[in-house]
């Protein structure tokens, strides 16, 4: 029996994608091979690779000024790869810290330069807000400004993206990419691990403006130098072929759903249902300012936290899995990515109401 999986990542995949992958496991399109067995330079895999790149460009409306790269190492590796590729002769990059992941990015950048904390969304209740542009204290000549536009752990999503003029804006979009349309032209770099909305763990997507490809530090490994990766069409070293294949299936699924405008409407409906339930309750609490509440990752706390384990056990009995909050913040977290259906959120809300009534 399939359950409703609210994992923050690796996360739920569309059932259509899983079934197609299962059907093609032993024989992809009459090739007699699994995608896992293909040469990454053979015509079979190259057709998968090129289709995935093209479909992602179409879905996000990526302009010709930007290259799409498939790398490895996830978002955490990009915390090092970004400064190694962008600092160049400059030593300073600015960071707007809105949660645990942008804090990790800030800390990692200290190994390669002098990161500057331009603004922080931390409050007495933790990370609960996204500082407005007027609050940012940018340095004089930063190599770039870094944001995490959706904080997976803290549930803070930044929707308003300012124009920074000539300063490249770098965004970690790991946990909301493909959940809504984005104006890619506003960004110098977008990066994200695949294991939330793109597909399975193993491939990292980087979208980088072409004019930023010549800024790498000399210490940057060749396999992580964006210019080298771009020049080799993301095939400089053996890529994560099966992860790219799964991502390609997800891209095709998204197109069948009507693209990002349609998926955004679905995500808004799911998030509203869950937040409305939390806010109407005297038993559940979300601490994030409403204007920046994440549509993808919804943390919430029980009024009586001694009942956390009972809540999780009851949820599991109903087929509602992976609801435990991150260890750094506690409580609960429902990750409601693209592949989580509205029916799953309705089932969760029904259970939350039942659990609250039993404890009243």
Swiss-Prot record:
**A Gene Ontology MF term for this entry?**
O-phospho-L-serine:2-oxoglutarate aminotransferase activity
Main site of residence? Answer: cytoplasm
Which subcellular locations apply to this protein?
A: Cytoplasm
Pathway(s) of this molecule: Amino-acid biosynthesis; L-serine biosynthesis; L-serine from 3-phospho-D-glycerate: step 2/3; Cofactor biosynthesis; pyridoxine 5'-phosphate biosynthesis; pyridoxine 5'-phosphate from D-erythrose 4-phosphate: step 3/5
Q: Which domain of life is it from?
A: Bacteria
One GO biological-process annotation of the entry reads:
pyridoxine biosynthetic process
Cited InterPro entries: Aminotrans_V_dom (IPR000192), Aminotrans_V_PyrdxlP_BS (IPR020578), Pser_aminoTfrase (IPR022278), PyrdxlP-dep_Trfase (IPR015424), PyrdxlP-dep_Trfase_major (IPR015421), PyrdxlP-dep_Trfase_small (IPR015422)
Q: Report the top EC class in one word.
A: transferase
Q: What is this protein called?
A: Phosphoserine aminotransferase
Gene from which this protein is expressed:
serC
């Amino acid at each position: 029996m399939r359950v409703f999986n609210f994992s923050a990542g690796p996360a739920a995949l569309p059932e259509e994608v899983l079934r197609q992958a299962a059907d093609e496991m032993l024989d992809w399109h009459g090739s007699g091979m699994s995608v896992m067995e293909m040469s990454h330079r053979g015509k079979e895999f190259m057709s998968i690779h090129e289709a995935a790149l093209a479909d992602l460009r179409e879905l996000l409306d990526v302009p010709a000024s930007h290259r799409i790269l498939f790398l490895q190492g996830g978002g955490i590796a990009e915390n090092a790869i970004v400064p190694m590729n962008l600092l160049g002769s400059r030593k300073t990059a600015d960071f707007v810290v809105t949660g645990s992941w942008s804090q990790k990015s800030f800390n990692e950048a200290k190994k390669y330069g002098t990161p500057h904390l331009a603004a922080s969304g931390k409050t007495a209740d933790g990370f609960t807000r996204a500082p407005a542009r007027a609050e940012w204290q940018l340095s004089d000549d930063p190599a770039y400004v870094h944001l995490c536009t959706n904080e997976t752990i803290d549930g803070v999503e930044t929707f308003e993206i300012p124009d920074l003029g000539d300063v490249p804006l770098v965004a970690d979009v790991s946990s909301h990419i493909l959940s809504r349309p984005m104006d890619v032209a506003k960004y110098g770099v977008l990066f994200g691990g695949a294991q939330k909305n793109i597909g399975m763990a193993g491939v990292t997507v980087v979208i980088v403006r072409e004019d930023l490809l010549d800024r790498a530090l000399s210490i940057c490994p060749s396999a992580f130098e964006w210019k080298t990766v771009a020049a080799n069409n993301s095939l400089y070293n053996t890529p994560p072929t099966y992860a790219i294949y799964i991502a390609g299936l997800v891209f095709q699924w998204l197109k069948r759903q009507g693209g990002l405008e349609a998926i955004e409407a679905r995500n808004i409906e799911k998030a509203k249902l869950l937040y409305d339930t939390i806010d109407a309750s005297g038993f559940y609490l979300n601490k994030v300012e409403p204007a920046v509440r994440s549509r993808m990752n919804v943390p919430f706390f029980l009024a009586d936290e001694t009942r956390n384990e009972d809540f999780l056990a009851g949820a599991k009995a109903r087929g509602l899995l992976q609801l435990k909050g991150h260890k750094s913040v506690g409580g609960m977290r429902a990750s409601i990515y693209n592949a989580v259906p509205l029916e799953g959120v309705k089932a969760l809300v029904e259970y939350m109401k039942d659990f609250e009534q039993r404890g009243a």
